[in-house]
């Protein structure tokens, strides 16, 4: 497998921090946008044993990840029956509106070439159920994402009830 939760790697800590910020009861469906090797999808399934977790990824030529690798990794962690992996595009998710209780993404959106980041976020929010939880962990540079405080206010104006921007760098990296 191409990841290891117990190896003391930084991504294990990042995943724990991302998931620790979710106010989620563990029921229903989780979507990970840009699942790569499946590590965060699998960590979510391990954290919430009643949840069904779907990981989507483009699996382009840049990284050596694939659907088959994700499925192998999920099987090795004993969660294959609750994890589904499928090819997908973060710019146009192939799910109906309000399909998921939780949508998560970890260090993915900055890799989506030619995307308007705020439109990309709105696409992820489109598949989130009302009252659901969205967590994005990424390099939130203003020149890439624009004014995120303004975007957070736009989301509030659109009816999203709780919108928080949380800097997790200290928790995840200790810096």
Predicted features by range, described:
Residues 1-17:
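Class I SAM-dependent methyltransferase Rossmann-like catalytic core
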Residues 26-36, 54:
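Conserved class I S-adenosyl-L-methionine
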Residues 37-49:
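Conserved SAM-binding loop of SAM-dependent methyltransferases across substrates and taxa
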Residues 48, 112-114, 128-130:
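Helix-to-beta-strand junctions that scaffold the AdoMet/dcAdoMet cofactor pocket
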Residues 79-90:
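Conserved SAM-binding strand-loop segment of SAM-dependent methyltransferases
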Residues 91-103:
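A short acidic, Gly/Pro-enriched loop at the edge of an enzyme's catalytic core
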Residues 118-130:
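A short glycine-rich, Lys/Arg-flanked "PGG" loop and its adjoining helix->strand segment in the class I
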Residues 131-138:
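Conserved beta-strand signature within the Rossmann-like core of class I S-adenosyl-L-methionine
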């Amino acid at each position: 497998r191409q990841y290891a939760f117990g190896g003391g790697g930084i991504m294990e800590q990042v995943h724990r921090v991302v998931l620790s910020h979710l106010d989620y009861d563990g029921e229903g469906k989780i979507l990970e946008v840009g699942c790569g090797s499946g590590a965060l999808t699998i960590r979510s399934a391990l954290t919430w044993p009643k949840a069904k977790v779907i990981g989507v990824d483009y699996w382009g030529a840049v990284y050596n990840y694939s659907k088959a690798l994700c499925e192998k990794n999920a099987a090795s962690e004993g969660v294959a029956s609750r994890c589904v992996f499928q090819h997908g595009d973060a710019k146009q998710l192939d799910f109906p509106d309000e399909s998921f209780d939780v949508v998560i993404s970890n260090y993915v959106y900055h890799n989506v070439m030619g995307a308007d980041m705020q439109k990309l976020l709105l696409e992820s929010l489109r598949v989130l159920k009302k009252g659901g939880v969205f967590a994005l962990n990424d390099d939130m540079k203003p020149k890439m994402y624009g004014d995120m405080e303004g975007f957070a206010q736009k989301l509030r104006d659109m009816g999203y009830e709780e919108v928080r921007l949380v800097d997790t760098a200290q928790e995840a990296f200790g810096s």
